[in-house]
């Protein structure tokens, strides 16, 4: 997968799971991330159609997929599935796909939702969407740092 670069256009982030996929999208300048929706997974064909619709409606130019790693940085049981999903997206949509370390995003998303006093029932889908926002915002912030030129003295 590719490293962050300076491509303009909206970026779609996915918090990939076996039952749900949380989605977030950037603004056109690639500065901020907003939660979009949570897709309930059914099968590859249905998932593909739903993602194609999101990509077309939002004029997506790049995709970021959360990479589930262990706290140590080692691969988890879900890491290979996420990599396979990212490769599938890259093949299906012919768009650049980046993998992004998603450690702590679900923990942080759950903390934020608990503090907002959202009911446990509503948290299920919201946590995936918020995790996608956190993945995308971290990606965008890193890209912004990489774009900055050194200060001249």
Curated annotation (Swiss-Prot):
The UniProt record lists the keyword Nuclease: yes
Keyword annotations of the record: Cytoplasm, Hydrolase, Nuclease, Ribosome biogenesis
Keyword Cytoplasm part of the UniProt annotation: yes
Top-level EC class as recorded in UniProt: hydrolase
Family classification: Belongs to the YqgF nuclease family.
HAMAP family: Nuclease_YqgF
GO CC annotation: cytosol
Gene Ontology biological-process annotations: rRNA 5'-end processing
GO MF assignments: nuclease activity
CDD domains, alphabetized: YqgF
Classification of source organism: Bacteria, Pseudomonadati, Acidobacteriota, Terriglobia, Terriglobales
Enzyme Commission number(s) of this protein: 3.1.-.-
Role description: Could be a nuclease involved in processing of the 5'-end of pre-16S rRNA.
Location within or outside the cell: Cytoplasm
Protein name: Putative pre-16S rRNA nuclease
């Amino acid at each position: 997968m590719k490293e962050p670069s300076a491509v303009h256009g909206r970026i779609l982030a996915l918090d990939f799971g076996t039952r749900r996929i949380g989605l977030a999208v950037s603004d056109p300048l690639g500065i901020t991330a907003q939660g979009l929706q949570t897709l309930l997974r059914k099968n590859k064909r249905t998932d593909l159609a739903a993602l194609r619709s999101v990509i077309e409606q939002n004029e997506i130019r790049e995709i970021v997929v959360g990479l589930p790693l262990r706290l140590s940085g080692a691969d988890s049981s879900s890491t290979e599935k996420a990599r396979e999903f990212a490769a599938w997206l890259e093949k299906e949509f012919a768009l650049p796909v980046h993998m992004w370390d998603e450690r702590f995003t679900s923990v942080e998303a759950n903390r934020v939702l608990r503090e907002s006093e959202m009911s446990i029932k509503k948290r299920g889908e919201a946590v995936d969407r918020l995790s996608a926002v956190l993945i995308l915002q971290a990606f965008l912030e890193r890209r912004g740092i990489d774009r900055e030129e050194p200060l001249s003295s």
